[in-house]
Amino acid sequence: LHQHFVTNNDRRIISQDMNRKTIGYNHARTELSTSITAKWMPTERLGLSVTLREEMYGAQWTPLIPAFYADYLISKRGTIRAKASVSRNYRYPTLNDLYFQPGGNTDLVPESGFSYDGGISFAVGKEGVYSLHGEATWFDSYIDDWILWLPLGGNTNYWTPLNMKDVHAYGVELKAGYDRMLSKEWQLGLDGNFSWTPSVNRGEAFSKGDRSLGRQLPYVPVYSAAVTGRLAYKSWRLLYKWCYYSERFTMTSNAFTYTGNVPYYLMNDVTLEKLFSARWADFSVKAAVKNLFDEEYVSVLGRPMPGINFEI
């Protein structure tokens, strides 16, 4: 059982036009989540589980949200496992979705739908020497009333969330990791992931001239990848992270125009971390260089992201 109280009391002036001021919103709601899980192992290799979850947002309860999971050990050698799941999705709009100023939309309805996924994984290694693991997952989701923030256009310069009637999100995710003990004090690690995630509007057009049907959702990259390298010596950690994001369309029509798409970009980060241990606590100090090669890129059209920057 989980319960928390969500509130926003943002009273700052967001914009001012002549005699009109736009300020933040002041809304709150209680959110409650409860779930129950049953597990069963009919054989030594097969595991099954069912989860029933229900959530409350303010005074409204979601329908019962079930999920079914299956896990089968194909081979003990290599720890090869097959996994599959079927689950119902139900998501209420956030407070920002409803009330953000400017742009919030109080007419939004909750997202709902079903998701299916299946995959296979393996893990091999020698204790104290090395470990190698990998995973491939396929997923398929059908979501009604997908909440999507879009620019209004015209004389306005802000975004608003809308419900997209029917969205088909599917794809493949690949993950792999390798760890090696070079000595008692030195450790080397490498992790990588790749995603192919089309998200397509299969429902209704927003208007008579809307060309979004059968096209990728705006600002959702079809391809993304990341590689992280780690080198550890005693209590020191050095991390290098490389990320790739494919181009993203800025309009529901997926038009290939100067303003119709955001180019792909690469990102490189380096982090140095020192771990400390005391009687009363364990803590760490980090120093990071973000955007190491000072790439010029944007995640949202017309909003340049920071060049090389530093964090401590």
Question: Where do the model's predicted regions map?
Answer:
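Short loop/turn motifs that connect adjacent beta-strands in outer-membrane beta-barrel proteins
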Residues: 44-45, 75-80, 125-132, 181-188, ...
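Transmembrane beta-strands of outer-membrane beta-barrel proteins
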Residues: 1, 48-50, 66, 80-84, ...
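Transmembrane beta-strands of outer-membrane beta-barrel pores
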Residues: 3-7, 32, 52-58, 86-92, ...
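Gram-negative outer-membrane beta-barrel transporters
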Residues: 41-47, 137-142, 163-252, 293
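Surface-exposed extracellular loop regions of Gram-negative outer-membrane beta-barrel proteins
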Residues: 1-9, 24-57, 63-69, 178, ...
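C-terminal beta-signal and adjacent terminal beta-strands/loops
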Residues: 244-253, 263, 272-312
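Membrane-embedded beta-barrel scaffold of Gram-negative outer-membrane proteins
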Residues: 4-7, 73-75, 81-83, 110-170, ...
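Outer-membrane beta-barrel "beta-signal"
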Residues: 69, 117-119, 306-312
